[in-house]
Amino acid sequence: MREIRLVPQGKALFALYLQKEPDGNIRGSFLPENSGKPVTFASLSRMVLLMEEAMDVPQESGERPIVQTPDFEVEILFRRNSTWQGILRRPGFRDGQNFRSVLELLTLLESNMAV
């Protein structure tokens, strides 16, 4: 039997800092909302695994360090098993792009980085 994990609305927010390599690979780091420690990743698939781990660990309380404006913000509204639903936003823009799965999130990130 699979464990069911739900994240209440607004509980998981990540600031993403991305860089596209000459070979097309996207790497970077993210900063969980309630943590002062950035997490680096070498691919989008690794990013997903590390974000999943970050949502399973209680976050530290305290102030978020002042850093540069992120490329994107990912808000996970619902999470059940390995399925995420949420919003991908660019800072400074009011509206975001909704996603209903991790695959949709990755597709949105890839298409936004191609621009």
Residue ranges of each PLM-predicted region?
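Mixed-charge, glycine-accented linear interaction segment located at domain edges/termini
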Residues: 30, 35-39, 50, 88-115
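Intrinsic disorder/low-complexity detector
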Residues: 1-14, 22-24, 49-82, 115
